[in-house]
Amino acid sequence: MKTISNNNTESNITEKMDTSKMDKLELLEKCKELGITKCSSKNKSELIKLINSKIKLQDVIDKESNMTISNEVINHHDTPIDELTTQSLNVIDLFCGCGGMSKGLTDAGLNIIAGIDIWDKAVESYNKNFEHNAYCEDLTKMPPEKFNELYNKENKKIDILVGGPPCQSFSIAGKRDKNDPRNALFMEYVKYLDYFKPKAFIMENVIGMLSKKTANGENVIDIIMEQLNRNYNCIINKLYASDFEVPQNRRRTIIIGIRKDLNILPKKPESIINTTQDRIPVKTILIPKEEIDKKYYLSEKALVGIANKKGKNKQKGFGFGAQMLDIDKPSYTIPARYWKDGYDALVKYNETEIRRLTIIELKRIQSFPDNYIIDGSNKDIIIQIGNAVACKFAYHIGKYIINILQ
């Protein structure tokens, strides 16, 4: 047995051994060294099995970290990145909604401390799916100092900040230019960055934020990046969720930042899907036709309306009034407005059998598991789904961040 010491922290690294050549007394002594108890009554084969299992477990632990971090309170400001385990990377999810981002990051192995959202329905859904809590708060009235006092009572170091300041909320009522992010919820996000100084952040938003301008003609993204670049090395990514195992062509802006003192330059996350042909088609998430309730099918009046609207829009050059899914390809983007008529993504069997997607199918398109609880009226549920970050997309972004930091 050899002992490695690093910064006064010791870990025992077990060398590989041939347990089959040991007698029972040697095996019992080895069990004692490995901390295996209550084994004196075991026979030789049982002892070998116990020892090999312990060694295998130790090897896994050793690969995760070259040292065992003590149970003392650690100041993560001073803890080298390579000494941190995945479980020690703590996350706050701002504008968390019903939890799509948190679900993906949790599955990736990150530790969510808390979520915050202003919509009570979304927070109620969130809290039915996680051990930690989300809190229904207005960020303009919840400065990070207050958050820390109320919801981070153990004063855990926040390593990653995530969230997507709502594009439609790029303003606070009564204040200057509504498109100027300096007047917006975006600045509340910046306040949390400045206060917690996390190692990394992930900011998600619609692709349209890249072309938005203020009343003065300034590019919104330039103003945003001016704030973010102060303390972080940043990269702006335009990513398709369908490249990350999501059955939906949802295109999003993802800004990733790594704190400058870490001397890491983030790169664009690599697609998980190699070609467009390998993207997950919508047919993989559809419920069999015979199981679909009649209420999801369009009425004759609606079918006529779609046909008429299609013709009018063609004449005006606006495209189609309703979008029929190609079931051999990923779905169109599912927006929060889908609850109104469902015309953004329809399943067409023939000219007289066209239907909307069910709640379960909408969840699957956003890569929520079927057992993920989203509560409220149909309208509330669909808005929550449409506003969410696709879980599988968040999962792969989480894995990307973990790889950067470790």
Task: Tell me the role of every PLM-derived stretch.
Residues 47, 267, 344-348:
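Short conserved micro-motifs at the rims of enzyme active sites and ligand-binding pockets
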Residues 48, 186, 190, 225, ...:
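Short, amphipathic alpha-helical "lid/cap" segments that border enzyme active or binding sites
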Residues 50, 54, 227, 396-404:
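C-terminal alpha-helix
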Residues 1-64:
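Basic helix-extension-helix modules of the SAP/HeH family
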Residues 145-157, 168-327:
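Class I S-adenosyl-L-methionine
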Residues 72-197, 207-211, 215-219:
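Core alpha/beta nucleotide-donor-binding catalytic domains of modification enzymes
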